[in-house]
Amino acid sequence: MAASSLEQKLSRLEAKLKQENREARRRIDLNLDISPQRPRPIIVITLSPAPAPSQRAALQLPLANDGGSRSPSSESSPQHPTPPTRPRHMLGLPSTLFTPRSMESIEIDQKLQEIMKQTGYLTIGGQRYQAEINDLENLGEMGSGTCGQVWKMRFRKTGHIIAVKQMRRSGNKEENKRILMDLDVVLKSHDCPYIVQCFGTFITNTDVFIAMELMGTCAEKLKKRMQGPIPERILGKMTVAIVKALYYLKEKHGVIHRDVKPSNILLDERGQIKLCDFGISGRLVDSKAKTRSAGCAAYMAPERIDPPDPTKPDYDIRADVWSLGISLVELATGQFPYKNCKTDFEVLTKVLQEEPPLLPGHMGFSGDFQSFVKDCLTKDHRKRPKYNKLLEHSFIKHYEILEVDVASWFKDVMAKTESPRTSGVLSQHHLPFFSTSVTWGAWPLAAQTPFQSGVIRCRGRVPSPRRATGGSGGQPCVCAGGPGPSFTEMGPSPSPMLSNTFFTPDPGACPGASTWGLPRRRLCQLLTTSTPGCC
């Protein structure tokens, strides 16, 4: 009976993951199938003022003495006999008139209004600039995912090169919650050096644009570029940064990330390591997460897969500690620890039934590193350490003070794994430009202007011939990374005044990408592709 109950839970969770993926694919296809010659109409929602008292319908108030009813204006209106009614018992009603769902909607609206006050400004290098989205010059697409696209842009007023994440606004409450959560966290985390920095936002009727610092690539793509493990010294510095970022989120903002994985860990040529993508982060109530968000099954903690009461999720930041442990094993060994899985169900079953993965003893890892990973992957979450305990671990203490030249290592890896620029070159004569009246996936290609030329390794979809108006069209290319802003510098800065740009497939792209470029998880080739957010 217990085994049957577990299978039912896993089946329900797998079904939820697939449903989320189908919805994500539907949204992407909807955006990409819109005719470019027909710009998306802007829908402006206005709240009408409350009707005057004279226009309001009379509110029937039950009388406690005789069971009848009268309207508020009954004293001044002609009296009419009313049919007899049976006496009514007055019931004590709760003082609030709002359901939890309506209160949640109100909270979303309030948060949006708060963020709207900050839109239209970029703060770069301590200087605040008033700006519009048209003040940004598009240098090319850097990547795309289930929640939008990421563009490399140049701020014309200063020449700064930044990353801009573009997400479409919709009537879907869950999508809007994800956008607002991402915005809320990055805007408030400006004082944490281990979280990707936000320069500002632009919000239109159709889109949300988040201007962020340009990072090099993510740990997931680095692993693919190297085609093997990442050195322990680099992972030591990475661990220090991510644990401190997660600790900051919990202590400063009461937030749990819920999507810790290699594709959400960013690095750059300066040696910086930062955490990104807070779309499915959750608020902690009494240090517990009270809401369920599927996230990526491959990195999900056992207590999230099989909670004591599935209707009342009740887990804490130690779920992210497990995800960090799985990520470290994957990056340190060069392969995902749960091997030969074909479905989410198989992964989830292995997480619950098998012993936690450990770092192999024959690969030369230090005892401190092995001990740290073992602590993170303690199956009983009640015995798994929290951040304050992890920060006292000898592995963290060692790499807090040890000097490691992450910048040189990063540059060396990026240089040695750069792809041939003559391989698989596709020509495309136009790049989309930003306008406050269009949305991602629906750019008016016929109206686009010539763009600067360069080599851009595409991690999203190259426009297909039926949607392009010039050049040789394109084809779907392999896609890596989830919806998180993997702000990847994919080649030299484009040179101005040339007529076209070449898109060349990236060597670190996922080999399991579907024909439409949707990201797949590494070892789980699902029939419906991966869970949104999985890579």
Curated annotation (Swiss-Prot):
Per the record, the similarity remark reads: Belongs to the protein kinase superfamily. STE Ser/Thr protein kinase family. MAP kinase kinase subfamily.
Region: D domain; residue ranges are: 37-73
Sections of the chain in a coiled coil: 2-30
Q: What is its main location?
A: nucleus
| Phosphothreonine modification, residue list | T291
The EC code for this enzyme is: 2.7.12.2
Cofactor(s) demanded: Mg(2+)
Q: Where is this region: DVD domain?
A: 393-416
The record's top EC class is transferase
Its domain comment says: The DVD domain (residues 393-413) contains a conserved docking site and is found in the mammalian MAP kinase kinases (MAP2Ks). The DVD sites bind to their specific upstream MAP kinase kinase kinases (MAP3Ks) and are essential for activation.
Subunit:
Interacts with RASSF7, the interaction promotes phosphorylation. Interacts with VRK2. Interacts (via its D domain) with its substrates MAPK8/JNK1, MAPK9/JNK2 and MAPK10/JNK3. Interacts (via its DVD domain) with MAP3Ks activators like MAP3K5/ASK1 and MAP3K1/MEKK1. Interacts with SH3RF1, MAPK8IP1/JIP1, MAPK8IP2/JIP2 and MAPK8IP3/JIP3 scaffold proteins. Found in a complex with SH3RF1, RAC1, MAP3K11/MLK3, MAPK8IP1/JIP1 and MAPK8/JNK1. Found in a complex with SH3RF1, RAC2, MAP3K7/TAK1, MAPK8IP1/JIP1, MAPK8/JNK1 and MAPK9/JNK2.
Name where it's found.
Answer: Nucleus; Cytoplasm
Compositionally biased region (Low complexity): 69-79
Instruction: Spell out the catalytic residues.
Output: D259 (proton acceptor)
Report the protein name in the record: Dual specificity mitogen-activated protein kinase kinase 7
As its record notes, the protein acts as a catalyst of:
L-seryl-[protein] + ATP = O-phospho-L-seryl-[protein] + ADP + H(+); L-threonyl-[protein] + ATP = O-phospho-L-threonyl-[protein] + ADP + H(+); L-tyrosyl-[protein] + ATP = O-phospho-L-tyrosyl-[protein] + ADP + H(+)
User: Where, per the database record, does this protein carry N-acetylalanine?
Assistant: A2
Residues forming the Protein kinase domain are 136-396
Q: Which residues carry this modification: Phosphoserine?
A: S287, S427
Q: How is it modified after translation?
A: Activated by phosphorylation on Ser-287 and Thr-291 by MAP kinase kinase kinases (MAP3Ks).
- Activity modulation comment: Activated by phosphorylation by specific MAP kinase kinase kinases such as MAP3K1/MEKK1, MAP3K3/MEKK3, MAP3K11/MLK3 and MAP3K12/DLK. Isoforms 3 and 4 have lower basal activity but a higher level of inducible activation, than isoforms 2, 6, 7 and 8.
In its UniProt entry, the species of origin is given as Mus musculus
Which positions in this protein are listed as binding ATP?
M142, G143, S144, G145, T146, C147, G148, Q149, V150, K165
Physiological role: Dual specificity protein kinase which acts as an essential component of the MAP kinase signal transduction pathway. Essential component of the stress-activated protein kinase/c-Jun N-terminal kinase (SAP/JNK) signaling pathway. With MAP2K4/MKK4, is the one of the only known kinase to directly activate the stress-activated protein kinase/c-Jun N-terminal kinases MAPK8/JNK1, MAPK9/JNK2 and MAPK10/JNK3. MAP2K4/MKK4 and MAP2K7/MKK7 both activate the JNKs by phosphorylation, but they differ in their preference for the phosphorylation site in the Thr-Pro-Tyr motif.
Quick one: a GO cellular component term? nucleus
